[in-house]
Amino acid sequence: MKIIGIIAEYNPFHNGHLYQIEKVKEIYPESIIIVAMSGNFLQRGEPAIVDKWVRAKQALLNGVDVVVEIPIAGCVQPADRFAENGVRILNNMGCEELFFGAEHAEYDFMTYAQLVQNLDSTEFSKKNISYAEAFQEAVAAKIGHNIDSPNDVLGLAYAKANLKFGKKLKLNPISRNVAGYHDKSLSPDSNIASATAIRKVLFSKDHNLVDKYLPSYQDLKDEKYISWDDFWPFLRYKLISSDIDELANIYGMAEGIQYRMKKKALELKVEATFDEWLKAVKSKRFTYTRLTRLSVATLVGMKVNDVSLYNKFPYVHLLGFTKNGQKALNIMKKNSEIPLLAKISQQDKDDFYHVDYRAGKIYQSQNYKEQDLKRAPLIF
């Protein structure tokens, strides 16, 4: 029994994701597939278009055997930390191989990881460019070419994490089929489109265009689609009503950015949108993605201590499984060092799960569905 791991967001689950799962089954027909998935807020600091339960259901109905949630403190992170938290979870769940999409599947990501493992990240802050740009420059100098496509960047991050944890996973990059990560339009000649293009159409309400790109559209068509527009009034209130010292304790705050975030929230016209606020706050050092992650941390009140605690005492939330997946869960219970939460209790929500619970309640304010407390895993 081969246990395969995937780290994903499924925002939403589309035919490109299905293609990846089918490739796994083609290579390992009897495998068990475990997915470590982002929750209601995603790695790049965006709210998921539909909640984690809908996305987990879509995965389980399309070939995945177990879906677990990467807690928000491990998920809303730069690529390296996101990858590290995902790989740590999959290692502890007994996965032997990691499959992931890549723009350049021919790259030897593990060799690249060995070449860049000793980069001095403290030097990056001395340059008048973003951390991501400084990192890209340093990587290119080590390996001889740029790695700047989104999934290649994640592939390198997975390899670095795998190196850190003793190379327990075999890495299997799969070429992205047709659509690029940030492609904004649907191709009429293919049934695969980027999640970016699909979300754009779903938000436009022109849903008849998107059906062929989604294997589980019926699960999506009656959902309310969530975006930053839904949470901007809450974030703006938080920025205006919080004092500077309080904001300074939010995870990711640095270089006094809290002053600028608060100032622009106060100064912009009443009808200003989240995107307009982002443009007003953005600088060379603070990219849009860095600011959206900061925005999530501010919205849910995720502090430096919360992330430190998660790093020391990680946990994972079980969202759903199939009968086949139950076998992998039985193995994990015997061998894992990370607690697996099947149902969130009152004690959990008041203890280590409090940030995830708060994030769920904030998301629930817009989709009106209980996200955590006493909610049982999906079983198929």
Swiss-Prot record:
Record Pfam families: HIGH_NTase1
Principal cellular location given in the protein's record: cytoplasm
EC number: 6.3.4.-
Annotated keywords: ATP-binding, Cytoplasm, Ligase, Nucleotide-binding, RNA-binding, tRNA processing, tRNA-binding
GO MF annotation terms: ATP binding; ligase activity, forming carbon-nitrogen bonds; tRNA binding
Catalytic activity: cytidine(34) in elongator tRNA(Met) + acetate + ATP = N(4)-acetylcytidine(34) in elongator tRNA(Met) + AMP + diphosphate
GO CC terms: cytoplasm
Keyword ATP-binding assigned: yes
Subcellular localization: Cytoplasm
A GO BP annotation: tRNA modification
Keyword Hydrolase: no
Binding site for ATP: 7-20, 101, 151, 176
Gene3D superfamilies: HUPs
Function field: Catalyzes the formation of N(4)-acetylcytidine (ac(4)C) at the wobble position of elongator tRNA(Met), using acetate and ATP as substrates. First activates an acetate ion to form acetyladenylate (Ac-AMP) and then transfers the acetyl group to tRNA to form ac(4)C34.
Family classification: Belongs to the TmcAL family.
Family annotation (NCBIfam families): cyt_tran_rel (TIGR00125), PRK13670.1 (NF010191)
PANTHER family referenced in this protein's UniProt entry, alphabetically: TRNA(MET) CYTIDINE ACETATE LIGASE
Annotated protein name in UniProt: tRNA(Met) cytidine acetate ligase
Record lineage: Bacteria, Bacillati, Bacillota, Bacilli, Lactobacillales
